[in-house]
């Protein structure tokens, strides 16, 4: 078949060369001018190909890039081509296969691959293959080199990947995952997971600390995150000893002012909460070994703190990421009655979006089919929370506690206090009512105010001039399961 030259794409990430060889292109141009015939180039049609911030369909060149350049220089509009696969491939999931096919084609003929080209291909494939499905032997056969050469090229990458895989296993194990669950995540057998858990030790941590190394160095040394490094270092210490080692003061009153997030715990995330707040909740309302359930995990602050304080943790979120294997995908639709864990938790740490406060930020984490609750109307938001509280009540044990963190929301923007419409507000009193009506007895109310420093001086001055009263109220409500809540005629009834 013949294709329009302008419709073809050269993708350097899958084309196995450091760059085009101008001498080869020039030789092909000279051959074309005297009527030489060239074999067809090899192409592949793909979708999900990223171009200028959008995903498109494209036709990629797998073999014949120098012929393509030569045909362009000679003014040809079309070029003969053959397809590798008749089926259009998903570029995102087929990139390694495309790279391997291109490499094999360019190893056999034409302007053959240099040793540097082959080395880079092997490293690209290895870095894109954390499950190590491409063995050194298989790569050697494709690239036309001996296995030992490939070993030399990619040994450092494979070592990091094995270390990373082992770190994931250790992390999930310490968070209370079963070996069967871990095996599914890392693609190993349960027996192999058991071996790694049993044989991995980090005794060198104390030695490194005694030599003056800090925790940042230790985390990098073991290719692990800081939270896991701290978890290993503080293992066996009491909660109070851990607070001291982490440099956190322990608050003994019901007002927790933590305005700064501790960068050691959790990822950068909309509405990220301070790790100290989570740690205080665990200290007062759980014991080591308890299971914590985080239904909207976000950047993973709760699981990181649970890791350090030796609590088990099951985390879920609408938006997941590769660097957070402990956070599993779940879209909450309380109406369908699906509860994603079988073991009953000791504490639910529920930190949902604070109504519409971060609607724009959360929008990027969701989609039309599974929207963030920050996009809900007031009625939809309240109904969601009521349904979640009821669903949770039906799936926990008698003494399970709910730690519910939320902030007052008032429509005070550009509105003087006297003219605010309270019908648009959602405050802690509403959340207290919802919990009580769905079978939860509130036992503690802890004030955790948001920082007022997020307002500029000009904003504050305008608020004064217009008599606008802002809100920085945020409250942690602790409630325990109490009674049985059932719905009759669209109203909740509590049976004690």
Task: Annotate each language-model stretch with its function.
Residues 1-85, 261:
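Short, charged/polar connector segments at secondary-structure boundaries
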Residues 15-18, 29, 69-175, 198-200:
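Amphipathic, charge-rich alpha-helical segments that serve as recognition/docking helices
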Residues 55-57, 163, 473:
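Exposed loop/turn and edge beta-strand positions of beta-sandwich/beta-sheet ligand-binding modules
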């Amino acid at each position: 078949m013949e294709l329009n030259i302008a419709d073809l794409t050269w993708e350097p990430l899958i084309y196995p060369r450091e760059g085009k060889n101008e001498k080869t292109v020039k030789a092909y141009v000279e051959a074309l001018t005297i009527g030489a015939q060239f074999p067809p180039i090899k192409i592949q049609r793909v979708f999900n190909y990223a171009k200028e911030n959008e995903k498109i369909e494209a036709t990629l060149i797998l073999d014949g890039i120098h012929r393509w350049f030569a045909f362009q220089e000679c003014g040809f509009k079309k070029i003969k081509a053959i397809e590798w696969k008749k089926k259009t491939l998903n570029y995102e999931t087929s990139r390694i296969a495309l790279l391997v096919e291109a490499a094999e084609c360019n190893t056999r003929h034409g302007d053959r691959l240099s040793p540097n080209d082959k080395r880079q291909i092997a490293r690209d494939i290895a870095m894109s293959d954390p499950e190590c499905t491409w063995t050194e032997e298989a790569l050697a056969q494709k690239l036309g080199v001996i296995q030992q050469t490939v070993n030399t090229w990619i040994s450092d990458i494979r070592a990091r990947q094995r270390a990373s895989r082992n770190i994931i296993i250790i992390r999930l194990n310490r968070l209370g995952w079963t070996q069967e669950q871990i095996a599914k995540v890392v693609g190993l057998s349960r027996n192999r997971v058991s071996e790694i858990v049993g044989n991995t030790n980090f005794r060198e941590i104390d030695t490194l600390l005694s030599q003056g190394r800090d925790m940042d160095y230790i985390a990098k040394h073991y290719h692990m995150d800081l939270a896991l490094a701290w978890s290993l270092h503080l293992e066996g210490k009491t909660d109070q000893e851990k607070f001291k080692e982490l440099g956190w003061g322990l608050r003994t009153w019901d007002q927790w002012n933590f305005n700064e997030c501790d960068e050691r715990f959790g990822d950068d995330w909309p509405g990220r909460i301070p790790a100290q707040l989570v740690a205080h909740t665990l200290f007062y309302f759980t014991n080591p070994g308890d299971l914590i359930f985080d239904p909207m995990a976000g950047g993973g602050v709760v699981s990181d703190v649970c890791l350090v304080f030796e609590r088990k943790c099951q985390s879920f979120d609408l938006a997941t990421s590769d660097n957070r294997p402990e956070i599993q995908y779940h879209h909450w639709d309380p109406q369908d009655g699906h509860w994603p864990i079988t073991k009953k938790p000791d504490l639910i740490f529920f930190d949902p979006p604070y109504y519409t406060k971060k609607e724009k930020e959360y929008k990027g984490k969701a989609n039309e089919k599974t929207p963030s609750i920050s996009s809900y109307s007031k009625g939809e938001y309240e109904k969601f929370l009521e349904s979640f509280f009821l669903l949770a009540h039906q799936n926990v044990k008698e003494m399970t506690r709910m730690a519910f963190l939320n902030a007052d929301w008032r429509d005070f923007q550009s509105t003087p206090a006297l003219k605010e419409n309270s019908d648009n507000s959602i405050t802690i009193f509403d959340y207290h009512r919802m919990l009580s009506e769905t079978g939860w007895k509130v036992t503690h109310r802890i004030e955790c105010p948001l920082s007022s420093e997020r307002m500029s001086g000009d904003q504050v001055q305008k608020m004064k001039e217009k008599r606008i009263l802002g809100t920085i109220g945020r409250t942690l409500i602790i409630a325990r399961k109490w009674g049985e809540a059932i719905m009759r005629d669209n109203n909740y009834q509590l049976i004690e």
